UniProtKB/Swiss-Prot annotation:
Belongs to the UPF0225 family. HAMAP family: UPF0225. It comes from the Bacteria. This is UPF0225 protein YchJ. The gene is ychJ. It holds the Pfam family SEC-C. InterPro entries: NTF2-like_dom_sf, SEC_C_motif, UPF0225, YchJ-like_M. The lineage of its organism: Bacteria, Pseudomonadati, Pseudomonadota, Gammaproteobacteria, Enterobacterales.
Amino acid sequence: MSQLCPCGSAVEYSLCCHPYVSGEKVAPDPEHLMRSRYCAFVMQDADYLIKTWHPSCGAAALRAELMTGFAHTEWLGLTVFEHCWQDADNIGFVSFVARFTEGGKTGAIIERSRFLKENGQWYYIDGTRPQFGRNDPCPCGSGKKFKKCCGQ
């Protein structure tokens, strides 16, 4: 039986992010890399996360922290609401909401991730967390106020 990809694409995992996470293919752009990294969090694949972090970030030192997070976090869904990059610039950005439960509480990560392309491969560098007012529209596109949606 086929399994839908956790990235929210509505495509089978084997045809969507699995080829990137397994190393069969290299993510062709920042959005695919971000979606496949989300899948790696869901699938608890620290190796892929470390491999796709830019080498300057020293991600290998985060392995223990990743493993601890895997044990306590259940990922509930991903919504990408903005992405932009230009291959000529070798830099790209993807904005998303990732929903999760941890310790019985539901939460969300809202981030604008920055990616860098080197030697034909995209890498995650870092992300910023935009601030939203409680009465602002939720960036996930639900049409609800932030406080009634991802800001809970």
